[in-house]
Amino acid sequence: MKLLLLACLAVPAIFAQQTSAPGGNLCNYTPVGDESTQDAVPIQDFRSSGLDFVRPNWCITHCADRKSVKVAARFQFANQSTAVPTYNVRRHYTRKSGVKVHAELISGTPTKRDDDDFNFCIDDTVSATIDTVVKTYNDIETMSEALNFYINKPGWAYVIYDMGVPPSVIGTDNVKQDMNYCEKFAQKQMPDGTWGLYQVFAGLIKAN
């Protein structure tokens, strides 16, 4: 499946992007080949926290209205073995079917979590903390700061999306099953009885 083209982004298959939305953010760093990238469109909003200042190893391109976003990051993985599985993952969120996930193995030996085949957050503590944060807080700004505070991993950066009203699509390339990497979604029932869906993309960012 080809990478989704964001509504306000012209996205070539490299780290350099262009945006026509005034007030948005543009990343134009030269790719090195090991980036993990994530596109989400359309979304309600997003926030980041942790070591999230803009730099070549962590940059978020987004439209001015923050309804579409592309994150490009270089992670410092704990396991450097070529046997570690790498996936391209697509999540489709629709009103009729909920969340549907397709994970394509790109390299390595496939492994799965016992509780959820499509939770690419293999640190159980990190995964559980994300679920707790999403269930505890109701605004995305507080959620993003709580992720950084409670997970408390030096050098990590976090981005969390409020997916809003479906439909929406999230595409993530170079997804690793590694203790220094996390890609998962969490949902909660809101006070009005509706369900909210949130996507988290996080990990230890390379120092240089």
Swiss-Prot record:
Entry's Gene Ontology BP terms: innate immune response
Highest taxon above the source species: Eukaryota
InterPro entries in alphabetical order: DUF5352 (IPR035274)
Residues of this chain annotated as glycosylated in UniProt: N79
Keywords: Glycoprotein
Protein name: Uncharacterized protein ZK1320.2
